[in-house]
Design a protein with these regions (language model features):
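Intrinsically disordered, low-complexity terminal tails
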Residues: 1-70
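Alpha-helical scaffold segments that mediate packing/assembly in large oligomeric complexes
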Residues: 149-201
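Phosphate-binding glycine-rich loops and adjacent basic patches that engage nucleotide phosphates
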Residues: 2-5, 38-44, 113, 128-139, ...
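Assembly/oligomerization interface modules of large self-assembling protein complexes
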Residues: 61-147
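Short alpha-helical interface patches
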Residues: 21-26, 30-36, 132-133, 140, ...
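Short, exposed beta-strand "edge-strand" segments with a Pro/Gly-rich flavor and a Y/T-containing core
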Residues: 15-19, 108-110, 146-153
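Charged/polar, solvent-exposed surface patches and flexible loops
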Residues: 23, 47, 66, 79, ...
C-alpha cells in the first residue's frame, strides 16, 4: 500500500497555522517521493482524489455525492471548492498586471518606493557623479481590503450534480472576485500611494 493511501484525513488539517490543506498533505505525503512514477504529475491532494477514485472532470466525471461516500473522502470537498474558485480568480487578468505577489498576514502592507525621477538620458563623464535611483521603504502603509463570497449550497440540490458542472459555477464566482480585485488593483496603480510600489514590483 502506497503512503498516500495510509494518510488519516481530518478536518483539522484545514486549520493548521501557516499551512494550507494541500501543504499539510504534502508534509505527510511528499510529492518528491513519486518522481519517475505514474503519480509524478499529481500533487498530494490529487493523489487523495485517486485514492478515493473521485474523478472531477472528463467523460466519467463523478457527481458531488462521491465525495461523501466516507468521512475521510468528505474532508477533500472544501479543497475542491477552493481550487475551483482559485482557478476562476487566476483566469482573470490579475496576474497580468501583477509583477510580484506577497502573502501578508496583517491588514496593512508596507512596500517600497522607487524614485528614479532623474533622467536616464544623461550622459556621464568618467569622473562625474552618476545619476541616482533611490529605493526606500514606504512611509504610509497600504490598507488591504478583503474580498469574499458566501456560497450557500443545498446538498440535496447538488448531490447528483456532476463535479465538472459545479466546478464551472465556482470558477465563475472566482472570476468575478478576481475582476473585483483587478478593479481595486488598477485604482491603486493610478493612485499616488500605490504608484511607486507598483513600479517597483
Amino acid at each position: 500500500m502506497a503512503l498516500f493511501e495510509k494518510i488519516n484525513l481530518e478536518k483539522g488539517m484545514y486549520h493548521l497555522t501557516g499551512k494550507s490543506f494541500t501543504e499539510a498533505l504534502e508534509a505527510l505525503d511528499p510529492s518528491s517521493q513519486y518522481a519517475d512514477t505514474p503519480l509524478a504529475k499529481l500533487d498530494a491532494y490529487e493523489r487523495q482524489l485517486k485514492r478515493f477514485d473521485i474523478r472531477i472532470s472528463g467523460k466519467n466525471c463523478d457527481r458531488v455525492e462521491k465525495f461523501f461516500t466516507s468521512t475521510e473522502s468528505a474532508v477533500l470537498f472544501p479543497e475542491f471548492i477552493r481550487r475551483s474558485i482559485r482557478q476562476g480568480i487566476d483566469s482573470s487578468v490579475l496576474s497580468d498586471i501583477s509583477a510580484a505577489e506577497t502573502k501578508c498576514s496583517s491588514s496593512q502592507y508596507l512596500g517600497c518606493e522607487l524614485d528614479d525621477s532623474v533622467s536616464y538620458d544623461i550622459v556621464t563623464d568618467q569622473s562625474a557623479e552618476l545619476p541616482k535611483t533611490e529605493i526606500s521603504e514606504q512611509t504610509a502603509p497600504l490598507i488591504l481590503k478583503k474580498y469574499a463570497r458566501a456560497i450557500h449550497i443545498s446538498y440535496e440540490a447538488i448531490r447528483r450534480q456532476r463535479l465538472d458542472v459545479l466546478s464551472v459555477m465556482l470558477k465563475s464566482v472566482g472570476m468575478k472576485l478576481g475582476n473585483a480585485v483587478v478593479k481595486a488593483a488598477v485604482a491603486v496603480l493610478k493612485s499616488e500611494a500605490g504608484s511607486s510600489t507598483a513600479i517597483a514590483g
